[in-house]
Structures are given as structure tokens and as C-alpha cells.
């Protein structure tokens, strides 16, 4: 049995006569060789490496083809597939955005090998019904992939003919989705989970071997580790490292600990790597799709061995933990910190819940080489946090940011999500003001557009997606679901791709782009005035943190435009001038915050926003036809308000959990018919993740 595991890239496709081609098929895009410059670095196919390790532990041998990072054209795919001649292919789609390429690759495989088994895994299998019916896929794996994939191989060994399925045998394997003998979707529940003791770290040598054999070079393995000198944060990182080292040296004088001095210049020549210390997430955010259930941590001994390997083999001096939910296990978090210090590497951690740590924890982590921590906050409005089911308060976030600032830990509240059901002008103002308060606390300037905000996108397998279907915003037929996935793949997180789930008009929602920034900057200015009794201090801070920062931001935006003009604008001077004038006018309106009251400036901003929206609508809206699945989509007037998140519905909720979008979706579901058929029950498993 020849087994091939492939990482599948996200990205849209251009449809041509006779075949599906990747976007930009005329260009060679390769994350390793950088034949087209990219600000991104390759991401190791961790899921694929995990599955192949478990396969080998159970007596199977397989090959890896890193399609995600190599980005081959169809001709290269065909050449490699013919070289390997697989009998079983596993396609790993970690995002719903991978759907077009899942379809493309499966089609090529079926054309080449009519009898090949095609198995799809990853978060994308929340759309299993669509994948099984609209692509050449035979089976989907729902949940953790290791155990069910090996059981599929066991099944194929006994039943090699893919056209003659033993439905009874397949039904005994947990974690599968397939089309049964009655042409109905069958989901056998979520898969068995590997126990924590069996979690393994990726074998980069296996990936290196794959790159050497299939479309790349073995030395490209080093591209997974970014040189720190290329990081925009290198100076800040070195400053924190110096602080940590000085503290350790002072402690050494008292406790006689053996402390190794850190050479800052040496650190600049190190590389940054990634490591997982846990698997899964304890949270249930209503916008987030999580196919992996439960929460497990890696063994401390295995972590230490892996960290030392990365340090010695790949010159890694700075590690980023890539956990979905770091520090949820307090005991394990302390073990991780001790290992990092023992191994002599500095580290950062993102995806931390603000309620998972306190001041003493942060202090301990800082003493054990933690440089940076990222908290996911999503909104500065308590109403929106409750709808997202974040289960913390914005005061919790503020307190953690304050403690990090006091301890000298670089921290970044992760990107804001705007436009969820229940979002209003008031909640957007709250978010802008909250971002301003955190930036003021951290002695930063007033650019509250950082961290960047993204518009909420409904991903299959989330309450947000089901809510959109309940309200007629996303269709329920296979063709409509496929059209939606193709659309969000093309536009991703842009405003144009956003489906308005709020009570406000599209024009009003577009204005929120500006409202968040302007309300935040007004709040920032007010904080300066309230915190400084001296007029001189007020003027100095307003100049340094507002006016000067705005000028620098304008210059930086111009620099970016001119660097990209040959690629994006193709020398069209008029278009460049229009964009420059637009940037200049927005910056001038920002400066107006320093001199004009809200009652005067905000109506001007709204009028400007409405004018911008008019031209955007005129440019993008399809004439003599209907736009679907974007901001211009005509909403279904036949859907009653009983399914929608309205302010009155939120106000009537007595408990936080009643404001959760999950609760609202469950109530909506009960108002319709309960699942009757086995297929409807299977679809509900995928929709609810249970």
C-alpha cells in the first residue's frame, strides 16, 4: 500500500475551460525559494507530520508532499503524483479556505488514478457533506486524525476495492464521515483522541527528506526558521532580553545560581522557531471552528528534547509557542517556562486567555525568559464579549495588560473581530475607546487601528455560520454552500466579503471602520488631558503621541504605496495620486480631533464615509444581477426577526450565557423542527461540534 499525505494550501482558484488552476498559475510562488517575494514564512505541516508518526508507530510507511509551501502548478502536481503512484492519499485542509484546492487536487488524483482512496482531514471537514458530494473525496476524518486514519488503513487492507464499501465496518470507526448505502451522509461522531502520553513532536528530518524528493531541496527545511535580524521587533526583543539577563545576574550574586550571560549580538544572529506545548482549546468562542476536542499537554521530557534539537540543529534562540490556548494548565505552563530557561532560549506565547494567568505567573514567566505574550480579546465591548462567549471581562484584559507593562513583558492584544451579530455603533465606540486606554497605558501613540481589526467571517462548524443559515444569509443547498466557500476564499477577511449580520444598514456598518479609529483617538486625547494637570505636559504629549505619530503614520503609508506601485498600480499615476489624497484627507481629519469637538468632526467623517461607500458600491456591485455572500448581498426579507440577534433580545437576557450566540442559535434551532433523518442528525454533529 503506497500512502501519501499532502498539506493543502488555502487560496482561490481561477476557473478555465477543462480544469481548475491555482490563482496566479502563470507565476511560480514558493514559500521556500521565495521566487516571488513574500512577507510570510513557511508553516510546517504539523498535522501531516503527526499523522505520519502515528502511522509508522502502527506499522505503516508513508510519504509527505508539502503542497502548501511548495505551491506547485498542475503540471508539477501531476508529475509528482505519477512518480509516487499512491493507493491512499490523505489531504490535510486546516482551514475552510482550503476548499478550492481540496477540490482541485482531488480531481487531478482521480483523473490519474481512478481507484485511489482520497481521505480529507482537518478543520475543513466541518463541511464534510459538501466535500463528499462535490469533490472526489471518499472519506472525511472528523476530529483528531491519527487514530481514525490508521483505522482507515486497516480497513483498506481488508477491503481494497473503494467501489465496494463495507458500510458496517466503516460505521464502527469513530471520527469518519462518508456517504452510506442509502446516499445519506453518515458521521460516526468525533474521533478518538490520542492520550497526552502519545503526543509526539514533528520529525523535521522526515519533512526534509520529502522536500528533497518531491519538488524542492532538502536545505529548504531551514526556511521554517526565520532569522531574528529580519524581525521588525528585534530591538524591542533585545531590550527585554537585556533586562532579563541583568536581573538574572543580580540574582546570581545572591543565590549563587549559574547564569549564562546573553550576548545580544549573538541573539540577533539566531533564528525564531515554533513549538506546541499543548493541543486543543478550553474555550468555545462562537466565531471559531475547532475540530480538535479536549485539551492535552505534551510531556515535559519530550518538550525539552525537542527544544534542544531546534536550538542545536537549526540555531533557534527564540521560540514561539503555537498553542491554541496556552497556559490553561498552570502546572504545565510553569514546566514549560523552566524548560525554556534551562535550554537557554527565549520565548513568546500567543493565544493566552487573560484569566489563565495572574501577576505572580507573569513574573515567574518573565524570570524564565518569556519576552512576549499575546492575549486574545476580540472586542472592547462587554456585550460583544458575551455574544462571542469569551467568558471574561474587558477589565480582566486591562489588568493583564497593565501587569505585563509593569513587568516589562512585551504584550499585544490580538486582533479585534468586528461585525458579529449584536454589534452596534455603541459597541464599536466602546472597542475604540478600550483600545485607546490600553495603548495609553503602554505609553504608545494613539494609532488605535493597531491591532488590526478584521470583519467576522462565518466559518462552517461555528454558531456564527449556523446563525447565518438560520437567517437566510448563507444558503443550505450544496451549490449555495460551495459558492459561499469559494467567495470567502477569494476575499477572506476584507470588508467586501463581510455579510452584514447586524441590525444596521451596510452604509452604517462601513462607517464603523472610521468610528472605531476616531472614537479611540478622541478617548486617547481625553486620557492625556485627564492624566496631566500641567498644560505644558499635556501639549508635549499631544504633540509626541498624537500629532507627530499621525505624521509618521502618513509618511509610512506613502512609503508603502511607492514601494508597491510597480506591482499594484502598474504605473497609473492618477490612481496613486487619488490614493495619496485619500490618505492625506483621512490624516487631516485625524488631526481635527485635536481641535474640533465630536459634534462637529464626526458628521464630517460620516459624510466622507458615505461618499466612499457610494463609490465602492458603484464599483463592485454587479449590475442586472444579485451579489451573494458579501456586503452588497440583498437580505432575505422572508426571514422573521424571531431568529435575529436584536438589542431587545440581548437586553432581555438575565445571564451572560443567555447572550452567547451559541445559546441564541440553540433556541432558534428548537423553534424549527428537530432532526428526523439520520443525515440531519449527522449534519447537526458537524454544525454543533458535538
Where are these regions (language model features)?
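Short hydrophobic segments within beta-strands
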Residues: 6-8, 65, 92, 121, ...
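A short, flexible N-terminal coil/short beta segment enriched in small residues
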Residues: 1-46
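Radical SAM enzyme core and accessory elements
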Residues: 3-5, 12-22, 81-87, 157, ...
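Glycine-rich beta-alpha loop elements in corrinoid/cobalamin-binding modules
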Residues: 47, 54, 61-196, 200-203, ...
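Structural recognition of alpha->loop->beta junctions
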Residues: 131-150, 367-375, 434-453
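A structural motif corresponding to the C-terminal end of an alpha-helix
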Residues: 51-63, 313-314, 403-411, 438-446
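Flexible glycine/acidic-rich beta-alpha junction loops that bind and position SAM and/or redox cofactors
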Residues: 13-14, 127-130, 283, 383, ...
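Radical SAM [4Fe-4S] cluster-binding motif and immediate context
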Residues: 43, 205-413, 418-420, 429-433
Amino acid at each position: 500500500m503506497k500512502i501519501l499525505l499532502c498539506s493543502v494550501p488555502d487560496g482561490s482558484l481561477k476557473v478555465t475551460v477543462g480544469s481548475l488552476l491555482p490563482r496566479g498559475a502563470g507565476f511560480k510562488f514558493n514559500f521556500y525559494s521565495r521566487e516571488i517575494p513574500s512577507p510570510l514564512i513557511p508553516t510546517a505541516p504539523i498535522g501531516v507530520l503527526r499523522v505520519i508518526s502515528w502511522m509508522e508507530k502502527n506499522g505503516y510507511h508513508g510519504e509527505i508532499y508539502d503542497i502548501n509551501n511548495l505551491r506547485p502548478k498542475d503540471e508539477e502536481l501531476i508529475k509528482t503524483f505519477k512518480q509516487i503512484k499512491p493507493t491512499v492519499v490523505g489531504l490535510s485542509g486546516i482551514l475552510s479556505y482550503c476548499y478550492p484546492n481540496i477540490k482541485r487536487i482531488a480531481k487531478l488524483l482521480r483523473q490519474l488514478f481512478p481507484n485511489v482512496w482520497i481521505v480529507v482531514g482537518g478543520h475543513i471537514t466541518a463541511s464534510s457533506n459538501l466535500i463528499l458530494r462535490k469533490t472526489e473525496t471518499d472519506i472525511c476524518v472528523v476530529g483528531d486524525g491519527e487514530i481514525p486514519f490508521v483505522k482507515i488503513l486497516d480497513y483498506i487492507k481488508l477491503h481494497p476495492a473503494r467501489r465496494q464499501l463495507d458500510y458496517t465496518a466503516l460505521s464502527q470507526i469513530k471520527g469518519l464521515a462518508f456517504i452510506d448505502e442509502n446516499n445519506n451522509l453518515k458521521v460516526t461522531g468525533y474521533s478518538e483522541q490520542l492520550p497526552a502520553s502519545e503526543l509526539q513532536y514533528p520529525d523535521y528530518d522526515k519533512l526534509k527528506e520529502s522536500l528533497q524528493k518531491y519538488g524542492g531541496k532538502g536545505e529548504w527545511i531551514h526556511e521554517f526558521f526565520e532569522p531574528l535580524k529580519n524581525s521588525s521587533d528585534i530591538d524591542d526583543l533585545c531590550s527585554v532580553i537585556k533586562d532579563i539577563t541583568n536581573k538574572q545576574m543580580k540574582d546570581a550574586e545572591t543565590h549563587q545560581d549559574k547564569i549564562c550571560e546573553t550576548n545580544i549580538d549573538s541573539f540577533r544572529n539566531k533564528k525564531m522557531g515554533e513549538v506546541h506545548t499543548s493541543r486543543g482549546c478550553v474555550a468555545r468562542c462562537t466565531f471559531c471552528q475547532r475540530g480538535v476536542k479536549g485539551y492535552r499537554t505534551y510531556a515535559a521530557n519530550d518538550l525539552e528534547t525537542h527544544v534542544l534539537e531546534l536550538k542545536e540543529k537549526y540555531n533557534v534562540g527564540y521560540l514561539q509557542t503555537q498553542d491554541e490556548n496556552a497556559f490553561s494548565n498552570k502546572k504545565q505552563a510553569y514546566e514549560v517556562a523552566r524548560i525554556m530557561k534551562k535550554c537557554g532560549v527565549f520565548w513568546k506565547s500567543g493565544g493566552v486567555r487573560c484569566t489563565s494567568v495572574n501577576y505572580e505567573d507573569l513574573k515567574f514567566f518573565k524570570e524564565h525568559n518569556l519576552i512576549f505574550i499575546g492575549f486574545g480579546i476580540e472586542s472592547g465591548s462587554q456585550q460583544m464579549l458575551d455574544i462571542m462567549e469569551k467568558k471574561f471581562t474587558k477589565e480582566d484584559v486591562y489588568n493583564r495588560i497593565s501587569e505585563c507593562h509593569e513587568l516589562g513583558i512585551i504584550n499585544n492584544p490580538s486582533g479585534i473581530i468586528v461585525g458579529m451579530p449584536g454589534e452596534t455603533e455603541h459597541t464599536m465606540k466602546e472597542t475604540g475607546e478600550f483600545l485607546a486606554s490600553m495603548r495609553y497605558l503602554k505609553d504608545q501613540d494613539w494609532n488605535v487601528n493597531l491591532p488590526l481589526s478584521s470583519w467576522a467571517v462565518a466559518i462552517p462548524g461555528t454558531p456564527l455560520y449556523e446563525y447565518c443559515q438560520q437567517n437566510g444569509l448563507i444558503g443550505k443547498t450544496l451549490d449555495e454552500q460551495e459558492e459561499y466557500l469559494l467567495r470567502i476564499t477569494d476575499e477572506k477577511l476584507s470588508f467586501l466579503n463581510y455579510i452584514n449580520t447586524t441590525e444596521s444598514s451596510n452604509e452604517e456598518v462601513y462607517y464603523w471602520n472610521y468610528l472605531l479609529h476616531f472614537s479611540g483617538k478622541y478617548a486617547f486625547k481625553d486620557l492625556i488631558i485627564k492624566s496631566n494637570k500641567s498644560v505644558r505636559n499635556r501639549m508635549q504629549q499631544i504633540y509626541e503621541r498624537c500629532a507627530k505619530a499621525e505624521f509618521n503614520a502618513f509618511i509610512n503609508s506613502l512609503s508603502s504605496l511607492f514601494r508597491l506601485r510597480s506591482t499594484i498600480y502598474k504605473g497609473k499615476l492618477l490612481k496613486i495620486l487619488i490614493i495619496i489624497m485619500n490618505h492625506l484627507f483621512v490624516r487631516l481629519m485625524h488631526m481635527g480631533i485635536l481641535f474640533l469637538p465630536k459634534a462637529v468632526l464626526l458628521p464630517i467623517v460620516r459624510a466622507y464615509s458615505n461618499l466612499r461607500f457610494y463609490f465602492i458600491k458603484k464599483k463592485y456591485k454587479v449590475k442586472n444581477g444579485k451579489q451573494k455572500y458579501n456586503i452588497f448581498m440583498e437580505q432575505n426579507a422572508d426571514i422573521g426577526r424571531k431568529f435575529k440577534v436584536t438589542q431587545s433580545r440581548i437586553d432581555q437576557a438575565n445571564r451572560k450565557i443567555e447572550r452567547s450566540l451559541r445559546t441564541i442559535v440553540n433556541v432558534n434551532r428548537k423553534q424549527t423542527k428537530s432532526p428526523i433523518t439520520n443525515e440531519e442528525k449527522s449534519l447537526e454533529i458537524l454544525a454543533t461540534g458535538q
